[in-house]
Amino acid sequence: MKRVLTATALLMATTGLASAEGSLQLYNWGNYTSPELLEKFTAETGITVTVTDYDSNDTALAKIEAGGHGFDLVVPSANYVSIFNEKGLTVPLDLAKLPNHANIAPEWKDVAWDAGRTTSIPWQWGTVGIAVDTAIYGGDINTSAVWLEVPDELKGKLNVVPEMMDIVTLATKYHGGEPCSEDLEVLKKVRDSLMAAKPNWVSMDYGATEKMANGDWAASVNWNGSSMRIRLERDTVAYGYPKEGYPLWMDSVMLLSDAQNVDNAYTFMNFIMQPENAALISNFARYANGISGSEAFMDPVMATAPEVVIPEEHKAAGFFMPTCNEKSREYMTAIWTELMK
């Protein structure tokens, strides 16, 4: 789920030696698709890729449900894969057309949200945590207290990404609840703490990579890859893993049921499961990818990056976000709607 978002953009790779013809429409999170990957794909296949950005799983879901979108592939987070499938918006994959499916790492091949990987393939995976400029705040950053009980040093300087599932879930874990909670006592604490904390936030925005790197913001609830990109430009920034609990996520590529360029979609999916090509995505976005052998082609700084390689002492607090039922989503949406007013 997760990334640094920009306004809608069209990234088109147009050069190359055509061994195939046509185009491909990819609907993906913003600032998440390597231009080098697209250029290489077009050079090798002759297929032109157009990437359209979205800013949240719910935005993508609503756009696809509305129809008439023209997209072939979408990249939802793990807890939305079953939703896309159940609504008939995506179709099972013909694995015979994906020989590189064998390159999916064993731990990502038979996952809870897609048994046997029959409807989705890995794009990137990571965590939700807190990026903090330690030159401004020197306290404990491995706690959601940083953004729910904002210390004086960070008041008016801390951003929160406007991602309902991530934010409500982090707050729920902080108050001792579980993901997708229907416990009204816990949810009241979540609602009250979010509303009390909001006046101390500078914004709820997706621009942490740029605004923390240039010093405009001092902290942000953020995704790990974005946080690494910030640190590479501003070395006083560190990434915290909330000890109360933090979500892990994986974004996966899915074939839409109304795709117009199905053959080209399969060509692209197979292409990105080649280790050296999966590494191009990771080197750009700064997340891990779930493809065996890709490590050999990745930027060496990622091999030891604390944002990418979860430190041993923080592993136990991580959990994969389940797909919430309708009632729990209603509760979260009610909290979120009030928070966003």
Specify the residue positions occupied by each region the protein language model found:
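Extracytoplasmic ligand-binding site segments that recognize negatively charged/polar headgroups
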Residues: G70, V75-D216
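A ligand-binding cleft/hinge motif common to bilobed small-molecule-binding domains
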Residues: Y80-I83, A213, A219-T236
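Ligand-binding "clamshell"
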Residues: N85-P92, D114-T118, R229-Y241, A303-P306
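A bilobed periplasmic-binding-protein/Venus flytrap-type ligand-binding module shared by bacterial periplasmic
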Residues: G129-I136, T172-Y174, M250-N261, M269, ...
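Conserved C-terminal helix/tail region of periplasmic/extracytoplasmic solute-binding proteins
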Residues: E210, E312-K341
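Mature extracytoplasmic/periplasmic domains
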Residues: L256-A316
